[in-house]
Amino acid sequence: MWTQRAGVDIIKHSEGSDPAAVVFDAVKAGIARDADVIICDTAGRLHNKKNLMDELKKIARIVNNNAPDSRVETLLVLDATTGQNAVNQARQFNEVADITGIILTKLDGTAKGGIIISITDDLQVPVKLVTVGEKIDDIQPFSARDFVEALFE
């Protein structure tokens, strides 16, 4: 559905397939098609599920080994409604995936996402994007000024 809305290709396997194999095929297809960007969505991973974190580590290794000259962004998607647990979650994801940025979701609700200050300070990674809705146009570049102003509204 999202790929159709965005007008992009999708590489997928049947349900239950090894996620790392899907990423391997996606990287190879992206290189063969001379793609500018390859997005690998590993949604649904919980930092306290060792097998899922091991898969994530394997995925990162596959990307780095098969596209060594590519610029790789590893973005952690955090829910703005998540509290203190988000700090621990971010640390654990960073240990296996070398996070380069954060996407903060659900800023359209009552959550202000103040925990992101602790996370960015702790990990020294920037917030790159925020979402303020569920449409593709609701993904916006992060503005520190707007974020701080919203915290104090």
Predicted regions and their residues:
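Short beta-alpha junctions and helix-cap segments that line functional grooves
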Residues: N88-Q89, G114-I116
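Helical hairpin unit composed of two closely spaced alpha helices linked by a short loop
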Residues: T100-G101
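Phosphate-centric recognition/catalysis
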Residues: T105
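Nucleotide-state-sensitive switch-loop elements of NTP-binding domains
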Residues: M1-E73, A97, T110, G114, ...
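C-terminal structured domain segments across diverse proteins
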Residues: G83-Q84, Q92-V96
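Short Gly/Pro-enriched loop/turn and capping motifs at secondary-structure junctions
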Residues: T81-G83, D108-T110
